[in-house]
């Protein structure tokens, strides 16, 4: 379990306003019990007045078990919200019965429901045979289908897929996407296989999942993850639709992240990175948080570092660069590069496509130290889990850590960052852009029509007639003195009123989702006096939503 400590928040980086707020309001708030709702209505007061941080008493090693790590974060959120869940139960039960019920449901939520372990043979192009290992974990079926990516990596393990599946459950709940969490992994290094061999592996893995009932539009819907993309998702969709889903009109909804020609959706490739950008945007534009960090709101003149130049890292870098932030370092598994004057994401992307690595990029120098310890405003770990640990957390110089990867921060590192007043924007919120747009793709496949197709021309004509009506009204009033009064929209407004494309709808819906979820997290952080502990606030929100589904549905066969 976690031990909670609370103290007045007097941040070393905070400006005079934040320090003043802490001095004026810490006395009142320190008198409250831990995790109790705050009375302050202004964001700055609750933020500056008090903070909770925690330490995992039973698991202090620098490389903790990944699934235990996620369970520990869950326990932290559950202990904060338990009293509220008991209070909100509208039953005739006694207080003790209500608490037993709440604790029982929390115990149901926490473990992984199903883990499928597979092994199957493939014949390689050279005639040799190889046995491939793979896993699919379904953490929760409180909502169906289950949802989660498929990754190809030699580091895949049962522990990893269980942890990632549980994160998917909480991630979907945080952004109000009605899926349960799942994850799959195939234990291979895709660089060691030809395209033909990868297709064999992908199609056979799909069939093995189908035989066990672990794939289907209403059951379990995979998506791209590490070392997989549109190509692999297309193979999965084709395999399912050509076999077990042959008579299912919704067969192509069995997987998301597909090419457009196979039922994919515009904006899915960049969705996770774009979600990372919107997530950072919502907090970096919040003056109350920035005052505690000693930063000015907005991206302008901010520096950032990206660890991992894959899909998430690239698109995060692109959007932050576009809005005025400067990327000064990029790290990959084979090395890092650095340029204090900034690195252009398009130029680096082109170089990597041509050379297969970021090393040797002519407009940056090799960086020999740890990319995580570069002096910057924003650090984006977008690689793998457990990168920020007790060992390196004291040397991290960033003021904001934006978790583009899943589980990049261990509990001990998380505690250190809270002690140092470093704002960690947690993974279960920040990288939820991918599953959000996957949800839109899934709905598109079930509806069998692209977004905007039914309304595109109607909206354009309606906007045209609205402007024409305004013009005619002005001419009736003033036209006799000066003739016609043309209404000429700006180029930007013209694009907007011409009708929203599918990409426009997806981008707008993603931005709205990330903004709404950020506001919910901020509200919870203030309500429970959590200060900069956004991770606990996000878990509290997720637990409340999942709990509500279980509680109102009832528990079968108990």
Curated annotation (Swiss-Prot):
Binding site for substrate: 84
Reactions the enzyme catalyzes: L-glutamate + NAD(+) + H2O = 2-oxoglutarate + NH4(+) + NADH + H(+); L-glutamate + NADP(+) + H2O = 2-oxoglutarate + NH4(+) + NADPH + H(+)
Pfam hit, one: ELFV_dehydrog
Subcellular location(s) per record: Mitochondrion matrix
Subunit text: Homohexamer.
Biological role: Important for recycling the chief excitatory neurotransmitter, glutamate, during neurotransmission.
Listed name of the protein: Glutamate dehydrogenase 2, mitochondrial
Chain positions found as ADP-ribosylcysteine: 172
Keywords carried by this UniProt record: ADP-ribosylation, Mitochondrion, NADP, Oxidoreductase, Transit peptide
Family to which the UniProt record says this protein belongs: Belongs to the Glu/Leu/Phe/Val dehydrogenases family.
One Gene Ontology MF term: L-leucine binding
């Amino acid at each position: 379990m976690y031990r909670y400590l609370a103290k007045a928040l007097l941040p070393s980086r905070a400006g005079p306003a934040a320090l003043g707020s802490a001095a004026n309001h810490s006395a009142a708030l320190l008198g409250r019990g831990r995790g109790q709702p705050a009375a302050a209505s202004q964001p700055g007061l609750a933020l500056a007045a008090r903070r909770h941080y925690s330490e995992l008493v039973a698991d202090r090693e620098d490389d903790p078990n990944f699934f235990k790590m996620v369970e520990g974060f869950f326990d932290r959120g559950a202990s904060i919200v338990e009293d509220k869940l008991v209070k909100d139960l509208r039953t005739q039960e006694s207080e003790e019965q209500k608490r037993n019920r709440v604790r029982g449901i929390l115990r149901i939520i926490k473990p992984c429901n199903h883990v499928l372990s597979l092994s199957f043979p493939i014949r390689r192009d050279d005639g040799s045979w190889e046995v491939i290992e793979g896993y699919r974990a379904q953490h929760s079926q409180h909502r169906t289908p289950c949802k989660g990516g498929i990754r190809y990596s030699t580091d895949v393990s049962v522990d990893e897929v269980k942890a990632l599946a549980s994160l998917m459950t909480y991630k979907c709940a945080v952004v109000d996407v009605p899926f349960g969490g799942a994850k799959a992994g195939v234990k291979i290094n895709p660089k060691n296989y030809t395209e033909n061999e990868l297709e064999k592996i992908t199609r056979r893995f799909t069939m093995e999942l189908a035989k066990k009932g672990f794939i289907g539009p209403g059951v379990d819907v995979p998506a791209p993850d590490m070392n997989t993309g549109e190509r692999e998702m297309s193979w999965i969709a084709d395999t399912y639709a050509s076999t077990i889903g042959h008579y299912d009109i919704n067969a192509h909804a069995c997987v998301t992240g597909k090419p457009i020609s196979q039922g994919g959706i515009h904006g899915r490739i960049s969705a996770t990175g774009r979600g990372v950008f919107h997530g950072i945007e919502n907090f970096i534009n919040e003056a109350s948080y920035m005052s505690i960090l000693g930063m000015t709101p907005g991206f302008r003149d901010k520096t950032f570092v990206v660890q991992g130049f894959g899909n998430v890292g690239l698109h995060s870098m692109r959007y932050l660069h576009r809005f005025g932030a400067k990327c000064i370092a990029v790290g990959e598994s084979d090395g890092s590069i650095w340029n204090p004057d900034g690195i252009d994401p398009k130029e680096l992307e082109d170089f990597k496509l041509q050379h297969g690595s970021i090393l040797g990029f002519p407009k940056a120098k090799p960086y020999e130290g740890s990319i995580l310890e570069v002096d910057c405003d924003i650090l984006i770990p977008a690689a793998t889990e457990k990168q920020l640990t007790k060992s390196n957390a004291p040397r991290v110089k960033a003021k904001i850590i934006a978790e583009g990867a899943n589980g990049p921060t261990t509990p001990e590192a998380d505690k250190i960052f809270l002690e140092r007043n470093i704002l960690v924007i947690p993974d279960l919120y920040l990288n939820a852009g991918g599953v959000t747009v996957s949800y839109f793709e899934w709905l598109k496949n079930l509806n069998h029509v692209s977004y905007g197709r039914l309304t595109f021309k109607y909206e354009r004509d309606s906007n045209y007639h609205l402007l024409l009506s305004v013009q005619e009204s002005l001419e009736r009033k003033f036209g006799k003195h000066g003739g016609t009064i043309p209404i000429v929209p700006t180029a930007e407004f013209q694009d907007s009123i011409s009708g929203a494309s599918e990409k426009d709808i997806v981008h707008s819906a993603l931005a709205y989702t990330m903004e709404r979820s950020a506001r919910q997290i901020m509200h919870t952080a203030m309500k429970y006096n959590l200060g900069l502990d956004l991770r606990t606030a996000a878990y509290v929100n997720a637990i409340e939503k999942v709990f509500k589904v279980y509680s109102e549905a009832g528990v079968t066969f108990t």
